[in-house]
């Protein structure tokens, strides 16, 4: 039995000796490595915050004091010392420990976040609430790993700076991606003095006395203050924070637990918001991660614990996009690539190697990415903005007002669209086809296979008077499904028997729809499967196909509310097509973490479930009654 097994809550940390705490840190790293090697997850960020997290929980009293993690993937250590060590082997498994903070798991988790740059706003609100209610509680926000490249973090800092009474401690986890390395001992000594309340009292006294001296007093104080600030600014990167009016402690070695505890205790005693700047190394304590040049094992696939070698993985959708965008870049000198701190994950790294001058990583700034793309389009370029589907939500206003309103030719490529699975509710890209339906002029494509991804990407970048979107899911693509016929701009994938059922298969659900068709054909039901390719706007040819069939069924890997099926039904209503309609999509709920296949089964987006429902509907129609839950044009 290890020491970690005896830690049921953060309170158990406070009685441990230095030697025991070192042992505990070692056990935590070992468990992190072994678990992520099998389950996958975020390893590098968590290896880098072991001592930092232990220090936070020894100095503060969670859950009375609230700890908010920005980009919650760095909360694994927090979970381990907050009672979840025994169940950590279920990390990212259905019904197991989430890869992000989860209110359902523990009272120590308050924010279920995986979107970056939000923690400071949560913390600002919490701290203000406790101040108003007269509660003596601290709020600790841990932010870093690039999250300070997001504008929302600076909006929060701008407001935090004027909330002088808020008991808010902001721990900047600087792993080399946001700030310069630590400077030295003098900076630490000066910042220790700077945040000492006694120093503040003395400074106020000196200010009052000097200002009372006629003529020279105010000037003397300003000179003294400028000298002190100038010396500190020369030694440590706190100038920007102090210019905002925030107290600053650091830099401090984030892997030195005792030093972290000392500065956190100083910050806790100060009556107001404080920045604690901790220098850490991503992947710390695991040599393969520290030597991994790309991202220090940020989120590796399954790997060998001894060597760090990742196990072979198959081809994914991202690889197809990555190859095709390079081909397009060679043919189109006006093509530029933009991403928001996701160069490798979205597959733009290959484009960057070929065309570095035409590739832009804007940091965690999706809003800026969209509007900058509009500017590039106005300047004669064609930008391709590659993001995860869930992160486009953050830039909706910019897509609508900055890109679409100005009829800019910008292509958005949405990776990890639809159900993503293991990363939980906030990573599912299940809203894009709903929110984008309201954007005038925007065209949206959903490829069913690799060949269609290449085809539709080429078509998208040819549009220079409106935004286009190409979206595809996470994981491995299916084999190419060739069309048997064409209807307008849509592909007919299956045409069997009589015109009983028209199945409209959106994007990656094409494979599912073909399977459904085989099951229906085996039961004597005639079926046509159509892939719209471009799902917005609705192709008039699909309206005519719907008019010819007895039942229309739409299948999409997107929310049912406001999605492609809902818009198709609305279009049929407007065209006077009264064919009964069945919509299959993602219900209007947040989906917990599990494998994609398990989630699709849970929500009924499997060939078996869909075919069964269609058989039931056709039976009702054959008997001369329309099922109550089949949507019907009126």
UniProtKB/Swiss-Prot annotation:
The keyword Ubl conjugation does not apply. Binds 1 Mg(2+) ion per subunit. Binds 1 thiamine pyrophosphate per subunit. Pathway: Metabolic intermediate biosynthesis; 1-deoxy-D-xylulose 5-phosphate biosynthesis; 1-deoxy-D-xylulose 5-phosphate from D-glyceraldehyde 3-phosphate and pyruvate: step 1/1. Keywords: Isoprene biosynthesis, Magnesium, Metal-binding, Thiamine biosynthesis, Thiamine pyrophosphate, Transferase. One of its GO terms (molecular function) is magnesium ion binding. It catalyses: D-glyceraldehyde 3-phosphate + pyruvate + H(+) = 1-deoxy-D-xylulose 5-phosphate + CO2. PROSITE patterns: TRANSKETOLASE_2. Mg(2+) binds at residues 145, 175. Its EC number is 2.2.1.7. GO terms for cellular component: cytosol. Gene3D superfamilies: 3.40.50.920, 3.40.50.970. SMART domains: Transket_pyr. InterPro entries: Dxylulose-5-P_synthase, THDP-binding, Transketo_C/PFOR_II, Transketolase-like_Pyr-bd, Transketolase_BS, Transketolase_C. Thiamine diphosphate binds at residues 73, 114-116, 146-147, 175, 286, 366. One of its GO terms (biological process) is isopentenyl diphosphate biosynthetic process, methylerythritol 4-phosphate pathway. The keyword Transferase applies. Its cofactor is Mg(2+); thiamine diphosphate. Belongs to the transketolase family. DXPS subfamily. Catalyzes the acyloin condensation reaction between C atoms 2 and 3 of pyruvate and glyceraldehyde 3-phosphate to yield 1-deoxy-D-xylulose-5-phosphate (DXP). PANTHER family: 1-D-DEOXYXYLULOSE 5-PHOSPHATE SYNTHASE-RELATED, 1-DEOXY-D-XYLULOSE-5-PHOSPHATE SYNTHASE, CHLOROPLASTIC. Homodimer. NCBIfam families: dxs, PRK05444.2-2. This is 1-deoxy-D-xylulose-5-phosphate synthase. It comes from Nocardioides sp. (strain ATCC BAA-499 / JS614).
């Amino acid at each position: 039995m290890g020491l970690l097994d005896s830690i049921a809550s953060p309170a158990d940390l406070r009685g441990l000796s230095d030697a025991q705490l070192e042992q505990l840190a070692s056990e935590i790293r070992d468990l992190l490595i072994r678990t992520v090697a099998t389950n996958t997850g975020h390893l590098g960020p968590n290896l880098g915050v072991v001592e930092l997290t232990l220090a936070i929980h020894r100095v503060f009293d969670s859950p009375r004091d609230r700890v908010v993690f920005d980009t919650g993937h760095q909360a694994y250590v927090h979970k381990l010392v907050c009672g979840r060590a025994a169940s950590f082997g279920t990390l990212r498994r259905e019904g197991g420990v989430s890869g992000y903070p989860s209110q359902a798991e523990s009272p120590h988790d308050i924010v279920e976040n995986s979107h970056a740059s939000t923690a400071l706003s949560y913390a600002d609100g919490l701290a203000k609430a406790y101040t108003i209610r007269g509660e003596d509680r601290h709020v600790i926000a841990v932010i870093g790993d690039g999250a300070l490249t997001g504008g929302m973090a600076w909006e929060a800092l701008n407001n935090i700076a004027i909330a002088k009474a808020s008991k808010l401690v902001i721990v900047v986890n600087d792993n080399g991606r946001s700030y310069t390395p630590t400077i030295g001992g003098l900076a630490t000594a000066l910042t220790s003095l700077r945040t000492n309340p006694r120093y503040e009292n003395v400074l106020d006294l000196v200010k009052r006395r000097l200002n009372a001296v006629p003529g020279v007093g105010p000037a003397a104080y300003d000179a003294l203050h400028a000298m002190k600030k100038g010396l500190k600014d020369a030694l440590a990167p706190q100038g920007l924070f102090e210019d905002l009016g925030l107290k600053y402690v650091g830099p401090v070695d984030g892997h030195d637990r005792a030093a972290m505890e000392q500065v956190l205790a100083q910050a806790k005693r100060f009556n107001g918001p404080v920045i604690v700047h901790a220098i850490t190394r991503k992947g710390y304590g695991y040599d393969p991660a520290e030597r991994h040049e790309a991202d220090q094992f940020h989120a590796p696939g399954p790997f060998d614990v001894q060597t760090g070698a990742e196990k072979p993985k198959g081809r994914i959708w991202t690889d197809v996009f990555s190859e095709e965008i390079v081909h397009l870049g060679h043919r189109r000198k006006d093509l530029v690539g933009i991403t928001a701190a996701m160069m490798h994950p979205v597959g733009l790294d290959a484009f960057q190697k070929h065309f570095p001058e035409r590739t832009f990583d804007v940091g965690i700034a999706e809003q800026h990415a969209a509007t900058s793309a509009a500017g590039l389009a106005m300047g004669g370029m064609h930008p391709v903005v590659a993001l995860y589907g869930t992160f486009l939500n953050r830039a909706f206003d910019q897509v609508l007002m900055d890109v679409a309103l100005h009829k800019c030719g910008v292509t958005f490529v949405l990776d990890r669209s639809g159900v993503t699975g293991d990363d939980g509710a906030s990573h599912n890209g299940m809203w894009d086809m709903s929110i984008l339906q309201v954007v005038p002029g925007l065209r949206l494509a959903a490829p069913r296979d690799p060949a269609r991804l290449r085809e539709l990407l080429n078509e998208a970048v040819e549009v220079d008077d409106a935004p286009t979107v190409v979206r595809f899911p996470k994981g491995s693509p299916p084999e190419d499904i060739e069309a048997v016929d064409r209807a307008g701009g849509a592909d007919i994938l299956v045409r069997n028997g009589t015109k009983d059922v028209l199945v409209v298969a959106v994007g990656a659900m094409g494979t599912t729809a073909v399977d459904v068709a085989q099951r229906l054909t085996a039961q004597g039901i005639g079926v046509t499967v159509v892939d719209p390719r471009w799902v917005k706007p609705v192709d008039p040819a699909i309206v005519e196909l719907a008019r010819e069939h007895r039942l229309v069924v739409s299948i999409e890997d997107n929310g049912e509310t406001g999605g492609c099926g809902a818009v198709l039904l609305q279009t049929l209503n407007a065209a006077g097509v009264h064919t009964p309609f069945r919509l299959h999509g993602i219900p209007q709920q947040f989906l917990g973490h599990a494998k994609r296949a398990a989630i699709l089964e849970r929500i009924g987006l499997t060939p078996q479930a869909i075919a069964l429902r269609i058989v039931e509907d056709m039976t009702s129609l054959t008997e001369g009654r329309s099922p109550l839950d089949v949507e019907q044009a009126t």
